[in-house]
């Protein structure tokens, strides 16, 4: 326990909390325009072609974000909505693109976890 004198000389410093998604600037989502849509490979031990997009946000940030789900209709100049959330096996990917919002369609024929992929409720047969 420090003495009062020690605290006067060197006060307590509170820890600075660093944001995990700085480009959002404390907003829940941000809109942006795709500048490049491509696939990339995950780090070991996984193997796949993960779909990602480079997005220029309305606040000027340029970020790499992940396109979840099977199949997508994104291309250059598509307007998308991004949210926070990293992809553990893709270094540098700290954002997700929201499915079923703006130019990105929801996942077709999705039956479970539909809200996460922007899929409408299927018609009862």
Swiss-Prot record:
Ranges that cross the membrane: none
A Gene Ontology molecular function term of the record: tRNA binding
GO cellular component: small ribosomal subunit
UniProt cross-references to Pfam families, sorted A to Z: Ribosom_S12_S23
Location of 3-methylthioaspartic acid modifications: 89
Signal peptide (residue range): none
Keyword vocabulary terms for this entry: Methylation, Ribonucleoprotein, Ribosomal protein, RNA-binding, rRNA-binding, tRNA-binding
GO biological process: translation
Superkingdom of origin: Bacteria
InterPro entries: NA-bd_OB-fold, Ribosomal_uS12, Ribosomal_uS12_bac
Gene3D superfamilies, A to Z: Nucleic acid-binding proteins
Listed HAMAP family: Ribosomal_uS12_B
Protein family per UniProt: Belongs to the universal ribosomal protein uS12 family.
Assembly and oligomerization: Part of the 30S ribosomal subunit. Contacts proteins S8 and S17. May interact with IF1 in the 30S initiation complex.
Described purpose of this protein according to its UniProt entry: With S4 and S5 plays an important role in translational accuracy. Interacts with and stabilizes bases of the 16S rRNA that are involved in tRNA selection in the A site and with the mRNA backbone. Located at the interface of the 30S and 50S subunits, it traverses the body of the 30S subunit contacting proteins on the other side and probably holding the rRNA structure together. The combined cluster of proteins S8, S12 and S17 appears to hold together the shoulder and platform of the 30S subunit.
Protein name in UniProt: Small ribosomal subunit protein uS12
Species annotation: Cupriavidus pinatubonensis (strain JMP 134 / LMG 1197)
Gene name as annotated: rpsL
